[in-house]
Amino acid sequence: MPEIRLRHVVSCSSQDSTHCAENLLKADTYRKWRAAKAGEKTISVVLQLEKEEQIHSVDIGNDGSAFVEVLVGSSAGGAGEQDYEVLLVTSSFMSPSESRSGSNPNRVRMFGPDKLVRAAAEKRWDRVKIVCSQPYSKDSPFGLSFVRFHSPPDKDEAEAPSQKVTVTKLGQFRVKEEDESANSLRPGALFFSRINKTSPVTASDPAGPSYAAATLQASSAASSASPVSRAIGSTSKPQESPKGKRKLDLNQEEKKTPSKPPAQLSPSVPKRPKLPAPTRTPATAPVPARAQGAVTGKPRGEGTEPRRPRAGPEELGKILQGVVVVLSGFQNPFRSELRDKALELGAKYRPDWTRDSTHLICAFANTPKYSQVLGLGGRIVRKEWVLDCHRMRRRLPSQRYLMAGPGSSSEEDEASHSGGSGDEAPKLPQKQPQTKTKPTQAAGPSSPQKPPTPEETKAASPVLQEDIDIEGVQSEGQDNGAEDSGDTEDELRRVAEQKEHRLPPGQEENGEDPYAGSTDENTDSEEHQEPPDLPVPELPDFFQGKHFFLYGEFPGDERRKLIRYVTAFNGELEDYMSDRVQFVITAQEWDPSFEEALMDNPSLAFVRPRWIYSCNEKQKLLPHQLYGVVPQA
């Protein structure tokens, strides 16, 4: 775009003796036009063009002005104030803060055709009026560094660019601008040309290794050496990155194993890493039932099946199939992660304990669900059972992960140790007349039954529930034939001592009932021991849909109690203050930060911990207004 030349200055409202308005006519960028003194709010200058031109773009270099406006007029009509038209609306060059601090006074802005007023830009003019203003600062004079006007490009120049070299004068130096279309070296040109030349060759390079890999694979099919097969596997994939090799899981290895010759399958099985067997201690869990079934009736070491390979991703959803879990004592986000892992393994989830529930995964003892399930004889395990099953990709016996606490009883031990696979749902004991003869009939050749001790005979009772307890402990000892017999004796002795304290008054010292079990009258202990056949009580969920946040310090273990109550009544605890929080539980007095929280969320309610305790005592939702935290007068 050709630059429009300026002829002379028609008029100027204010100018400095050194930095006069004529400096705008010169090409030197260091010559400026400034006001005569500081404190003026508006100054203006009128410039005469050489001829009438259509202005296509304007370049303005600032020198301390906050706003600049450009107007155009014609000298033929007298060019009065009313004859000027706005070409460039008032544009900002400095913000108020920049004006007061004096920062960025020489900002340059280029206004193209889209920034100019179209009606004025389409006409021809020979006079330009520039108005500068600075209302924010009175400390220093202001003005312009330079102004450039450009006419529209010619059609011939747009079609065929001019080959002449333009020269820009910058102070005492002249900058020569060369045509960008000239063939010259650019930074990185040789590098990109080398890549373009070598790219066809690199595209055909993988053909060589693939052919060699196919030849090696065909020649090694007859050999049965496993090292050669591994070398083939490494040669057939030369482009595979180490990062990709690390991501190969065991499932992909199992998929590749059937494709190998049968002779290579047998030596590869023993080389798989085996998990260390758990050491047997008096507190260890019994052997899984499927291993016991293979050993029953045969000497040790015969009939044992080889270790099954770890389950792949396609079998991951069948590991805990048939298991229904209930969570207790966990907080989000770990609660949701544990639930997702259990569902990924094929288990089902229930928010509360139901008849089809099989396992209660508890974070710690003495939670409300823990006491409920313990009274119903359910199975309570630790979270490590689900985590280890997910990590090992196979179903582990849940006996190793049983919760050990003061509330455990022989009925719980019986439910946790009995069953075929060790993971079936616990069932209540059934009354059967031939219960006393079961331990003798169930004894196999691999687990010899020793004669009952006097203490066991003394512990015999006509009460059918107590006989079932003795049977459960004895059958446990039979199932654990590989364990030490001392554990079974200690367990029988402990149960016998417990039953001895509950003997009915009419029973003799030798353990025989004088009524021979013919009486229909039940004792108080029997009624107390028999679990009632009632539906599982469900906890109220009056906190459902409500979000809580614990703020500040709480004395003692009050925070843990509040978390338990809110979780038990189906409330949601937030880890941090968010828009979802509805109730803020705090033991402190009114805090100034509460007012800021109310400004962001007017529906917030600040309550005392006593509200949670009262809701637990009444087992219903009470009005929180009676327990609110209010500002002190």
UniProtKB/Swiss-Prot annotation:
Mark out the compositionally biased spans (Low complexity).
221-231, 277-291, 427-443
* Biological-process GO terms, alphabetical: base-excision repair; double-strand break repair; double-strand break repair via nonhomologous end joining; hippocampus development; negative regulation of protection from non-homologous end joining at telomere; negative regulation of protein ADP-ribosylation; regulation of base-excision repair; response to hydroperoxide
The entry's note on the tissues where this protein occurs is: Expressed in fibroblasts, retinal pigmented epithelial cells and lymphoblastoid cells (at protein level).
Q: This chain belongs to which protein, by name?
A: DNA repair protein XRCC1
Molecular function terms from GO: 3' overhang single-stranded DNA endodeoxyribonuclease activity; ADP-D-ribose modification-dependent protein binding; enzyme binding; oxidized DNA binding; poly-ADP-D-ribose binding
> What is the species listed in this Swiss-Prot or TrEMBL entry?
Homo sapiens (Human)
Where is the segment annotated Disordered? 221-313, 400-462, 471-490, 498-536
Q: Which Pfam families match?
A: BRCT, BRCT_2, XRCC1_N
Q: What GO terms fall under cellular component here?
A: chromatin; chromosome, telomeric region; ERCC4-ERCC1 complex; nucleolus; nucleoplasm; nucleus; site of DNA damage
What processing steps or modifications follow its translation?
Phosphorylation of Ser-371 causes dimer dissociation. Phosphorylation by CK2 promotes interaction with APTX and APLF.
Q: What is the lineage of its organism?
A: Eukaryota, Metazoa, Chordata, Craniata, Vertebrata
The UniProt feature for the cross-link Glycyl lysine isopeptide (Lys-Gly) (interchain with G-Cter in SUMO1) gives its location as 176
